[in-house]
Amino acid sequence: MTDERHVLVIFPHPDDETFSSAGTLASYIQKGTPVTYACLTLGQMGRNLGDPPFATRESLPSIRERELEEACKVIGITDLRKMGLRDKTVEFEPYEHIDGMIKSLIDDTNPSLIISFYPGYAVHPDHEATADAVIRTVERIPKEERPRLTLVAFSNDATEALGEPDIQNDITDFKELKIKAFEAHASQTGPFLKQLASPEIDGKQHSFLTVEPYWTYHFKS
């Protein structure tokens, strides 16, 4: 894993950080690298209410906020920024607002590395809107001053379109930590945790707990 001055993580929902990057972020933190996580929404419209249900539509926002805070504690993230956008509306944010928000984060943290989603291969509209905003904002920075972008892609055609991920972080030592971070997001991850605990877990799911893949984004100019 590379040595970094500061890692800035930008995702739209609580649990995005855990699914994609819990082990990678914990590894950076263990090395003493500052990590800032900007979570754009609180996942107010999350599809699940617990398994069995323990949340309501009214209580879910506050529950997911607490889950986010707990997952960050598990990973070791101490600089959590809750950016205040609303779940499932990120794609409707004016460019000047969301781009300005991201530019302020970059100016404040001066990251050498940004972790976010890869545009076109992130499936959910909020994921795609976040990815697009990160690319637009970083592209405006002079080339020699830009942070590197290592991005998460998980659409079915990602590998076919982008090739194999050029970064595959071995997180074997953080497998149990990643599971604990999943457990922190209890309202959303119950069914997935049951799959992970199954003796019939397949190779893809197992690798999910041992390797975190990323694609480096290259600007045309």
Where are each of the predicted segments found?
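Metal-dependent de-N-acetylase/amidase catalytic core
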Residues: M1-L8, K31, D79, K88, ...
